[in-house]
């Protein structure tokens, strides 16, 4: 598996130059360059709290979820609520958002402080994912939902229409698999919680009686539990890396 792409330390790139680059890559003409700059600024930069991307990320996450849910609702009229939820989660998770950040080339435009180099691969992936969501919020505030929808469709539409069957929720899958191994249940435990309050990282361990435990990380307890469940499903051969079960 490829290691997460490192982020550069903060560098001086003019707001106009940044906007020009992103206008070409997003198809959107940015009206508020100060807000765009904020969307690209990590909290490690020594600046007032409102000068980083965190508030924009909050809004962009909601706009992305709504727009992708709408795309899936229209594209899969026969899909159940459960299948739509699985597809939605796969399309808005950190891995997908970070991959789109790489397509856009955002890593070279994100402003970070020197301490960003101490973050592990998972946290760096999360930074790139966060900036994509902040960028969505910037587009939304510039041009409304239609402008945000246009950008999201540009990068998410093809992914949303992939014909492969949606993979089931990892915790549900592990629960059923564990039951088949002798009527046992997975047990999840939080091993640690690190990072600031606004950007925590949870380390969770899952155990199934008779099997070695597995660990997973995530920005919430739920995501970390899913990550741990996925790790065990892959290790035990229940899931394959090609997406088959």
From Swiss-Prot:
Oxidoreductase in keyword set: no
Binding site for Mg(2+): 57, 130, 133
UniProt xrefs under CDD domains: DSRM_RNAse_III_family (cd10845), RIBOc (cd00593)
Keyword rRNA processing applies: yes
Top EC category: hydrolase
NCBIfam families noted in UniProt: RNaseIII
Protein name stated in the entry: Ribonuclease 3
């Amino acid at each position: 598996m490829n290691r997460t792409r490192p982020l550069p330390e903060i560098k001086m790139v003019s707001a106009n130059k940044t906007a020009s680059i992103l206008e070409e890559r997003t198809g959107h003409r940015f009206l508020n360059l100060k807000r765009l700059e904020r969307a690209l600024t990590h909290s490690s930069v020594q600046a007032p709290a409102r000068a980083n991307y965190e508030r924009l990320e909050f809004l962009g996450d909601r706009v992305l979820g709504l727009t992708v849910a709408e795309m899936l609702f229209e594209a899969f009229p026969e899909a159940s609520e459960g299948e739509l939820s699985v597809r939605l989660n796969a399309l808005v998770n950190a891995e997908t958002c970070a991959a789109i950040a790489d397509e856009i080339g955002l890593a070279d435009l994100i402003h970070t402080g020197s301490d960003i180099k101490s973050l592990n691969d998972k946290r760096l992936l999360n930074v790139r994912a966060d900036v994509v969501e902040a960028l969505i919020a910037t587009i939304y505030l510039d041009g409304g939902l239609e402008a945000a929808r246009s950008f999201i469709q540009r990068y998410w539409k093809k992914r949303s229409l992939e014909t492969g069957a949606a993979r089931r929720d990892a915790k549900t899958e592990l629960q059923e698999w564990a039951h088949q191994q002798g009527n046992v249940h997975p047990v999840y435990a939080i091993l640690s919680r690190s990072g600031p309050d606004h950007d925590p990282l949870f380390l969770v361990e899952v155990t199934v009686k008779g099997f070695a435990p597995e660990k997973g990380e995530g920005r919430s307890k739920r995501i970390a539990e899913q990550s741990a469940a996925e790790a065990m499903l892959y290790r035990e051969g229940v899931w394959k890396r090609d997406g088959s079960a």
